From Swiss-Prot:
NCBIfam families: PRK00010.1. The lineage of its organism: Bacteria, Pseudomonadati, Acidobacteriota, Terriglobia, Bryobacterales. GO terms for biological process: translation. This is Large ribosomal subunit protein uL5. Pfam families: Ribosomal_L5, Ribosomal_L5_C. It comes from Solibacter usitatus (strain Ellin6076). HAMAP family: Ribosomal_uL5_B (MF_01333_B). One of its GO terms (molecular function) is structural constituent of ribosome. Coiled coil: none annotated. Keywords: Ribonucleoprotein, Ribosomal protein, RNA-binding, rRNA-binding, tRNA-binding. It comes from the Bacteria. The keyword tRNA-binding applies.
């Protein structure tokens, strides 16, 4: 079964964007390419056990096993050695990406305290959107009793849009709650 949001994209988003930006070809309409979720754990240099919790939680949130990111070079001021684990990340594509985006927009973001919408200024100039989350507990997959420390994460939504206006229109029609 295809993801619910993929059907929404094909039936509602594509016609709306084609009308708004007057695309001549359906393939020119912007679409979600991938979603990258990254957790940076600077404290993992002192305590390596913190990394295990982050990897497990990110795996539960994303639905696939994360990759552990390692330091590319040593920095003495940060007490960091080359090759030391400093974070973890996941790249989602296809149905998993649509399911995660659906959960993010409809379940997780509304659970943020005092949530009034996400900023529309976090585009990079090429239609890609980045958002930071301070607490992983907004996702329903995380069991509150098993969390040792709250961890934030960066979520980067990569689209095929050429401009920020196209990217904003794409995400807005797919249900992303932008601040007015």
């Amino acid at each position: 079964m295809a993801a619910r949001l993929r059907e929404h994209y094909q039936t509602k988003t594509v016609p709306a964007l084609t009308k708004e930006f007057s695309y001549k070809n359906v393939m020119a309409v912007p679409k979600l390419e991938k979603i990258t979720i990254n957790i940076g754990m600077g404290e993992a240099t002192q305590n390596a056990k913190l990394m295990d919790g982050a990897v497990n939680e990110l795996g539960q949130i994303a639905g696939q096993k994360p990759v552990i990111t390692k330091a590319t070079k040593s920095i003495a001021q940060f007490k960091l050695r080359e090759g030391q684990a400093i974070g973890c990340m996941v790249t989602l594509r296809g149905d998993r990406m649509f399911e995660f985006f659906d959960r993010l927009v409809n379940v997780a973001l509304p659970r943020v305290r005092d949530f009034r919408g996400v900023s529309s200024k976090s585009f990079d100039g090429r239609g890609n959107y980045t958002l930071g989350i301070k607490d992983q507990l907004i996702f329903p997959e995380i069991d509150y009793s098993k969390v040792d420390k709250t961890k934030g994460m960066n979520i980067c939504i990569t689209t095929t849009a050429r401009t920020d206006a196209e990217g904003l229109a794409l995400l807005r029609t797919m249900g992303m709650p932008f601040r007015q």
